[in-house]
From Swiss-Prot:
The gene is rpsB. It comes from Corynebacterium diphtheriae (strain ATCC 700971 / NCTC 13129 / Biotype gravis). Belongs to the universal ribosomal protein uS2 family. The keyword Ribonucleoprotein applies. PROSITE patterns: RIBOSOMAL_S2_1. One of its GO terms (cellular component) is cytosolic small ribosomal subunit. This is Small ribosomal subunit protein uS2. Keywords: Ribonucleoprotein, Ribosomal protein. One of its GO terms (biological process) is translation. The keyword Ribonucleoprotein applies. CDD domains: RPS2. One of its GO terms (molecular function) is structural constituent of ribosome. Pfam families: Ribosomal_S2.
């Protein structure tokens, strides 16, 4: 069964690219035609590339990997947040801080500070002894940190791969990923550079419905990857238990043989 159908892509407007005057010539091979000054993306190719991206994400998660969802443009914010939270993956949907990956140690300190402020706010007497002005400043600091770092609060190390909506807008994130050899899976609109993406998904990165349907595909791959991981872990546990039982039986047989040998000697 297909991960997503041609009809679903058409209904979501995934095939609509940018105006013909706003394009990247490197995207030529992904373009089917142009209509009324708008490039039309070849959805047959999109389906093929979706399958490749899907398998990569699924296998990455199946082997214990983490996928970081990135989409800070207005049209992507809600979908990125909702889908990442639905599958338990980290996300950035408001602002990409320079060094979020390449200087993760510093970012980790900011995460620690955010959690300190959250604990203070949750405690019954967390603000005891502080003035109203101090409480207001601490609240503002916490809110600001949560807005920018809330989606990666539980991320303890750099991700295994990254899902990106609009590689042009998220060029800093993509650049940092490349420096750390983190594979990038991304929607490629007709004004994007395919050379900066490891697993391209040719499609409309401006329409909310298009972003939503493609991000859901990635989330489905994450879910399948988690299932595969659990199945492998269960199989490994059963195998380990089986080996333990075999060892125990062998030990009992050996002990019985020794007793029999001693009895015969007497």
């Amino acid at each position: 069964m297909a991960v997503v159908t041609m009809r679903e892509l058409l209904d979501a407007g995934v095939h609509f690219g940018h105006q013909t005057r706003r394009w990247n010539p490197k995207m030529r091979r992904f373009i089917f035609t142009d209509r009324n000054g708008i490039y039309i993306i070849d959805l047959q190719q999109t389906l093929t590339y979706i399958d490749e991206a899907y398998e990569f994400v699924k296998e990455t998660v199946a082997h214990g990997g983490t996928i970081l969802y990135v989409g800070t443009k207005k049209q992507a914010q809600e979908s990125v947040k909702n889908e990442a939270e639905r599958v338990g993956m980290p996300y950035v949907n408001h602002r990409w801080l320079g060094g979020m990956l390449t200087n993760f140690q510093t970012v980790s300190k900011r995460l620690h500070r955010m959690k300190e402020l959250q604990a203070m706010d949750a405690a019954e007497n967390g603000y005891e002894g502080r003035t109203k002005k101090e409480v207001l400043m601490l609240t503002r600091e916490r809110t600001k940190l949560e807005r920018v770092l809330g989606g990666i609060a539980d991320m303890t190390k750099t991700p295994s791969a990254m899902w990106v909506v609009d590689t042009n807008k998220e060029h800093i994130a993509v650049s940092e990923a490349h420096k750390l050899n983190i594979p990038v899976v991304a929607i490629l609109d007709t004004n994007c550079d395919p050379d900066v993406v490891n697993f391209p998904v040719p499609g409309n990165d401006d329409a909310i419905r298009s972003i939503d349907v493609l991000t859901k595909v990635i989330s489905h791959a994450v879910i399948e990857g988690k299932k595969a991981r659990e199945e492998r872990a269960l199989a490994a546990a059963k195998e380990a238990a089986g080996d333990a039982n075999k060892t125990e039986v062998a030990a009992k047989v050996e002990a019985t043989e020794e007793v029999a040998a001693e009895a015969e000697a007497k």
